[in-house]
Amino acid sequence: MSRLGIMVLTLLLLVFIVTSHQDAGEKQATQRDAINFRWRRSLIRRTATEECEEYCEDEEKTCCGLEDGEPVCATTCLG
């Protein structure tokens, strides 16, 4: 094989290695963003649940969750 052929193959191999490395980095960043989103979402949900529990505690009832952003309190939660 000529020198030019070897150089072209080497260049193609380098391009392949660089692009696959970039793809792996982007995938890792996407996974990290997804984990951060889940963590923030659970934190928001936990805060809302705590507020609901405090609100219903004043009425001596159980917090059954939020409906349209408002706490739903009842003596017994169904479903």
From Swiss-Prot:
* Transmembrane intervals: none
Q: Which residues form the propeptide?
A: 21-44
| Source organism superkingdom | Eukaryota
Keyword terms:
Amidation, Cleavage on pair of basic residues, Disulfide bond, Knottin, Neurotoxin, Secreted, Signal, Toxin
In the UniProt record, the signal sequence range is: 1-20
Q: Which residues carry this modification: Leucine amide?
A: 78
* Cellular component annotations (GO), alphabetically ordered: extracellular region
**The keyword Transmembrane is annotated on this UniProt entry:** no
Q: Which cysteines are joined by disulfide bonds?
A: 52-64, 56-73, 63-77
Q: Where in the cell is it found?
A: Secreted
GO MF terms listed in the record are: ion channel inhibitor activity; toxin activity
* InterPro entries per record: Conotoxin (IPR004214)
Tissue spec: Expressed by the venom duct.
- Return the similarity comment: Belongs to the conotoxin O3 superfamily.
Q: What is known of its domains?
A: The presence of a 'disulfide through disulfide knot' structurally defines this protein as a knottin.
- What name does this protein carry? Conotoxin PnMSGL-03
